Amino acid sequence: MNLKPIGDRLVLKKQEKEEEKTFSGIVLPSSAKEAPVYAEVLAIGSEVEEDEKMKGNIKVGDKVIYSKYAGTEIKLEDTDYILVKYEDILAVVE
């Protein structure tokens, strides 16, 4: 199943982080971690592709940092996705 974002939205796939440990070696459970802010762009809405100000800034496959509380989380076929607006993308990781 494919997600096709509408307007100025993007479909992102959250990037898994490695297991985190404290300085003393205690493994932090995922519930103790902050919400992920790194993701890979899987699809881009038509408005982002056509608007002169947005066009070319973000491409499918880019790794991005997005606003922590932005977007709508969706789970399809055991995969977690997040739909965010273009304005919620803070940076492209190069």
UniProtKB/Swiss-Prot annotation:
Main location: cytoplasm
Subunit structure: Heptamer of 7 subunits arranged in a ring. Interacts with the chaperonin GroEL.
Gene: groES
Family: Belongs to the GroES chaperonin family.
Keyword Cytoplasm: yes
Record-given protein name: Co-chaperonin GroES
GO BP annotation list: chaperone cofactor-dependent protein refolding
SUPFAM superfamilies (UniProt xref): GroES-like
Record keywords, A-Z: Chaperone, Cytoplasm, Stress response
Keyword Glycoprotein: no
